């Protein structure tokens, strides 16, 4: 009973953005938080870096460079997603097209928001991230917890609960529904 698209193996194009301490306000500025649905935030992801004052694309911002167009794996620095606990940041990155974010570390709340929105946050050492950033595409194998370039494989850790949710495409509601018969049995006993 998958409620979100499961993630098992994923091959995608990368874009490096090696800034440390990218906070949720840099990911999605608060001025754009007026929507109540999860969609429509992609055009505002990294708004202040992505666009020049006249509204045109900033050619120096990596995700705007031609070689990174269509990237679905973001490789970034340490402490990604720090700052306020806005889930809109995860929504913006997902709507932009990212499925996987590889960083040195994540804010705990942002990490959880990624997994709740079917994005895989992966923690890797700087040397591994620098190696992976040399390639156009890399492959992630969630069941085996590896990230691979054509010539090297890196292991990553993930809590079994988050892994189970992502591999099986389960959101919180789908997990609750797994216990529906027990819930009904309990309700009848009242």
Curated annotation (Swiss-Prot):
Q: Show the GO MF annotations.
A: 3-isopropylmalate dehydratase activity
Q: Which reaction does it catalyse?
A: (2R,3S)-3-isopropylmalate = (2S)-2-isopropylmalate
Q: What's the top EC group for this one?
A: lyase
Q: Which Pfam families does the record associate with it? A: Aconitase_C (PF00694)
Enzyme Commission identifier(s): 4.2.1.33
Q: Name one GO cellular component term.
A: 3-isopropylmalate dehydratase complex
Asked if Lyase is a keyword of the record, the answer is yes
- Which pathway does it operate in? Amino-acid biosynthesis; L-leucine biosynthesis; L-leucine from 3-methyl-2-oxobutanoate: step 2/4
* Assigned keywords, A-Z: Amino-acid biosynthesis, Branched-chain amino acid biosynthesis, Leucine biosynthesis, Lyase
One GO biological process this protein is involved in is: L-leucine biosynthetic process
Record text on subunit structure and interactions: Heterodimer of LeuC and LeuD.
| Its biological purpose | Catalyzes the isomerization between 2-isopropylmalate and 3-isopropylmalate, via the formation of 2-isopropylmaleate.
Checking NCBIfam families in the record gives: leuD, PRK01641.1
Assigned protein family:
Belongs to the LeuD family. LeuD type 1 subfamily.
Protein name according to UniProt: 3-isopropylmalate dehydratase small subunit
Species per Swiss-Prot/TrEMBL record: Staphylococcus aureus (strain NCTC 8325 / PS 47)
**Species lineage, top-down?**
Bacteria, Bacillati, Bacillota, Bacilli, Bacillales
